[in-house]
Amino acid sequence: MLALGKLLELTLAGREPAEKTQLTVEGVRMRWLAEGALEVRPPQARDNGTDLLLSAGIHGNETAPIELLDELIRSIARGDLKPRARILFLFGNPAAMRLGARYVEQDVNRLFNGRHEQSGGAEALRACELERLAASFFSLPDRYRLHYDLHTAIRGSKIEQFALYPWKEGRQHSRFELARLRAAGISAVLLQNKPSIVFSAYTYEQLGAEAFTLELGKARPFGQNRHVNLAPLRLRLEQIIEGSEPQPDERLEGLQLFSVAREVIKRSDAFTFNLADDVENFSELEKGYVLAEDVSDSRWVVKEEGARIIFPNPKVKNGLRAGIVIVPADADGLG
């Protein structure tokens, strides 16, 4: 196996490879670009015009997706997986990965779309570098751009594997891409309705990629992910990489769609959620329930039918989103 197949090992050790460019027997070029960043380019005669960005480790303790990317990289380096797509593999926050922590000082996934310019520190610099790497990768014209940013969640979920689909004014969400996610084992998709500051929103809004944040189960340490079933996703990624993907069923049967009703913003240290600490993502909320309270008698009362909560986190910094209230959506308006 080529040494660059050990990108994860190099990243966790904080080392640069001795050789920054290597070729497989099949003529696939693997090129180390920066810490945790590897570009894979097929021979020109095999290139099918797809540019695939796969990122994981934006939160350093979300190890199942990191291990999945490691397996794909090693398969390419051994010559078992024969790409027809260009691929950029990114391990998002190496410093946090080495600590086994979500982040060191700042949540990197709140620092995109210009937010890093308003901040300082190593993680703001890393967000800037990730934007630069993605922009350079997606700079070639007339190619199909796809980005999956892979995560696991802090808490359990009533729907274990789901996706968040960014939004941009004037652009339709793609039925084909939703069908592709369903075939990859994703059970639900949240259709966003406003700009965002996460990595997938940057590549979707600024770089024209089809981009998604994928939540793939609960965060666990390295080597403890045997209960996380990523086999359908891995198979679909291998098919996209090799250009052997069967046409997905665009009827979207079995895929639950949701839209954002509103975000719960933490305004002060007085903020409290009226939810159990271990409440799961997609837990249902009764209409009229007082969901959260904050300073100056601020209250979030559930007004929507069929409402659910995702990403409840009262420990975020003041001014940030502490949770999202979502409601069922239909497939009308998909492109």
Swiss-Prot record:
Q: Which HAMAP family match?
A: Arg_catab_AstE (MF_00767)
Q: What is its EC number?
A: 3.5.1.96
Q: What is this protein called?
A: Succinylglutamate desuccinylase
Enzyme class, top EC level, equals hydrolase
Catalyzed reactions: N-succinyl-L-glutamate + H2O = L-glutamate + succinate
Family annotation (Pfam families)? AstE_AspA_cat (PF24827), AstE_AspA_hybrid (PF04952)
- Keywords in alphabetical order: Arginine metabolism, Hydrolase, Metal-binding, Zinc
**Sites where the protein binds Zn(2+):** 59, 62, 151
UniProt record similarity statement: Belongs to the AspA/AstE family. Succinylglutamate desuccinylase subfamily.
Annotated active site residues, numbered on this chain, are 215
Asked whether the UniProt record includes tRNA processing among its keywords, one would answer no
Q: Which cofactor does it need?
A: Zn(2+)
What the record notes about the co-factor is: Binds 1 zinc ion per subunit.
Q: Write out the GO MF terms.
A: hydrolase activity, acting on ester bonds; succinylglutamate desuccinylase activity; zinc ion binding
Q: In which pathway does it act?
A: Amino-acid degradation; L-arginine degradation via AST pathway; L-glutamate and succinate from L-arginine: step 5/5
Functional description taken from the UniProt entry: Transforms N(2)-succinylglutamate into succinate and glutamate.
CDD domains membership = M14_ASTE
Give the UniProt record's GO annotations in the biological process aspect.
Answer: arginine catabolic process to glutamate; arginine catabolic process to succinate
Superkingdom of the organism of origin: Bacteria
